């Protein structure tokens, strides 16, 4: 046998190696298929329906159509079309990966709450390196102990005395109302809301507002944030081919964000050093600082690490409240009856302060905001990668009522824009703006605008309060 290999023509060696490699891949695939079949049988799982694709191996047909949707700014309609005519749970192949699409609330509950440790974010967001050089670790990009650490850095988000403090909104809202065009004039309110939110959030995070309402040119950083988000989203979706694309516009936006962050991080580290020096000297250090950056810097002494943590908090959420509030106004402007009910509820409050408790007690105002969340969710999808073989409760079999096997490496995506218009939960008028539906029925996992489970958005109470406060002031 040794002699035979020694006499093997050199030109045949690559063919032999390729054949061995192919056989090894085939053998591994067969072993995995048997293993998954046995697990599915043991766990009572049934097959998931597949959506037809022209390319069932790499899914390049859907990759191309999604790329066009993202570039053409019609991604949400594209998602709706993807689900059209399909069962509530189905599978596709996308860039070679198995992706489970579902709009079952029970699957969302399992994904983010019951079996949440079987699903991760880090393999999707950090593993692909799509966010580099913008940022690496942050509360919305890591799992496990890294996530526990990142969450500890943003503890002020969870403090009631912070998110329930509406007095911090008063001066910025007074300023906004002063500079808005007079009654009767038609204007675009979105830029005003963006600058208002930029002032509100920079005061909370950095301890001082940017004064973007006074100086509109300072909102330049907002446009850079939008470019960073757009580029990062594209890179995440097209990570296998992202090195073939020119990202110079994205890198320029990152440079603006990094300069913005570096200036404030250098300043806070200098303030901490001075603070500690005064303590050692026995001098008065004044009242405790409550801004978020101060708290984060105390727990994270590394500049690059802090910039990453801060960027992944500030940039994705830079205009969350302003977009939500603009959408609420858009709907109320087209529904005079609903607007009249909001105004009546606010005016009945009289001249009393608009406290957190008062705003929570304005049920129709809250219903109007929730109905906007339902129709125009800021968080369009919830996406996780499976890190341990597990199951989801629904989607298997011809009726979709049996469990399904989710294998390590599978991606699960819940499309909330479709789920939140399911007639089963929202009646026969799911496309109609009707806040009363939130007064008629309590909703559970079919409506989780800020996600659910341990990784629920930590700023959910703050966003809801800020939007309610501004709408009430406008009323």
Curated annotation (Swiss-Prot):
Localization of this protein: Membrane
Recorded topology in the membrane: Single-pass membrane protein
A Gene Ontology biological process term: mycotoxin biosynthetic process
Protein name in UniProt: Cytochrome P450 monooxygenase opdE
GO cellular component, one term: membrane
Species per Swiss-Prot/TrEMBL record: Penicillium oxalicum (strain 114-2 / CGMCC 5302)
Cross-referenced Gene3D superfamilies: Cytochrome P450
GO molecular function: heme binding; iron ion binding; oxidoreductase activity, acting on paired donors, with incorporation or reduction of molecular oxygen, reduced flavin or flavoprotein as one donor, and incorporation of one atom of oxygen
């Amino acid at each position: 046998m040794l002699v035979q290999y020694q006499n093997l023509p050199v030109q045949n060696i690559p063919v032999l190696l390729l054949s061995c490699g192919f056989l090894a891949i085939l053998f591994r695939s067969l072993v995995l298929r048997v293993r998954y079949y046995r697990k599915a049988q043991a766990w009572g799982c049934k097959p998931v329906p597949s959506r037809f694709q022209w390319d069932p191996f790499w899914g390049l047909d859907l990759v191309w159509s999604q790329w066009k949707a993202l570039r053409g700014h019609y991604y949400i309609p594209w998602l709706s079309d993807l689900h059209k005519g399909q069962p509530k749970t189905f599978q596709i192949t996308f860039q070679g990966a198995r992706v489970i699409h579902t709009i079952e609330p029970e699957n969302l509950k399992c994904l983010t709450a019951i079996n949440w440790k079987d699903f991760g974010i880090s393999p999707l967001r950090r593993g692909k390196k799509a966010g580099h050089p913008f940022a690496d670790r942050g509360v919305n990009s890591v799992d496990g102990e890294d996530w526990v650490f990142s969450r500890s850095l943003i503890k002020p988000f969870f403090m009631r005395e912070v998110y329930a403090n509406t007095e911090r909104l008063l001066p910025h809202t007074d300023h906004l109302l002063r500079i808005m065009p007079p009654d009767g004039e038609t204007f675009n309110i979105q830029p005003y809301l963006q600058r208002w939110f930029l002032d509100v959030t920079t005061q909370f995070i950095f301890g001082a507002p940017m004064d973007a309402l006074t100086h509109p040119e300072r909102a330049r950083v907002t446009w850079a944030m939008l470019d960073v988000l757009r580029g990062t989203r594209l890179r995440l979706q097209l990570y296998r081919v992202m090195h073939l694309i020119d990202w110079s516009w994205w890198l320029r936006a990152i440079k603006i964000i990094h300069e913005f962050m570096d200036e404030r991080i250098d300043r806070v580290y200098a303030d901490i050093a001075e603070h500690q020096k005064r303590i050692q000297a026995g001098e008065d250090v004044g009242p405790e600082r409550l801004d978020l950056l101060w708290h984060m810097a105390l727990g994270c002494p590394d500049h690059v690490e802090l910039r990453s943590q801060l960027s992944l908090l500030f940039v994705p959420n830079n205009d969350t409240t302003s977009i939500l509030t603009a959408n609420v106004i858009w709907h109320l402007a087209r529904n005079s009856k609903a607007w009249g009910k909001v105004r009546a509820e606010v005016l009945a409050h009289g001249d009393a302060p608009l406290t957190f408790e008062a705003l929570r007690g304005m049920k129709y105002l809250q219903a109007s905001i929730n109905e906007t969340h339902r129709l125009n969710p800021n968080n369009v999808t919830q996406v996780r990668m499976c890190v341990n073989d597990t199951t989801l409760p629904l989607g298997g079999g011809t009726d979709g009522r049996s469990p399904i096997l989710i294998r390590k490496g599978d991606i699960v995506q819940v499309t909330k824009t479709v789920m939140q218009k399911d007639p089963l939960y929202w009646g026969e008028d799911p496309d109609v703006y009707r806040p009363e539906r939130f007064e008629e029925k309590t909703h559970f996992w079919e409506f989780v605008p800020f996600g659910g489970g341990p990784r629920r958005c930590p700023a959910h109470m703050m966003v809801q309060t800020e939007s309610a406060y501004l709408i009430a002031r406008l009323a």
